[in-house]
Amino acid sequence: MKHLAMLFSVLALFAMPVQAFDAGTKKALPTTTVAELPKEGRDTLALIRKGGPFPYAAKDGSSFSNRERTLPKQPRGYYKEYTVKTPGSRDRGARRIVCGGKEQRECYYTADHYKTFKLIQE
């Protein structure tokens, strides 16, 4: 019985919601789900999971420096950025997904060119 209680305690830790904090303000970043992303955002996230190919190969997958300090502080090179196509835009537009970590599993969506981010919960 003691082991069962311990197992449930450990499982409860994994069920807790993930939060990310703005490195500059220390406020929790808002979250979004994959389903709430625009279609183009879901498409970009699928390409990230597949490893490409990306429509903006020269820029997609490049290092995101987090100069604005809106994402949690991490070592240089931790974050990579990817373009989320904007219908009707002649350039890359303002929408991006920024992912971090070795397997690029910690991802954030911005619709306003890095001013604000939402943690994507999968």
Q: Where are each of the predicted segments found?
A:
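Hydrophobic helical h-region of N-terminal Sec-dependent signal peptides
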Residues: 6-10
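N-terminal secretory signal peptides
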Residues: 20-70
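Functional cores of ribonucleases/endoribonucleases
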Residues: 53-122
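N-terminal signal peptide c-region/cleavage motif recognized by signal peptidases
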Residues: 15-17
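Positively charged n-region of N-terminal signal peptides that target proteins for export
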Residues: 1-4
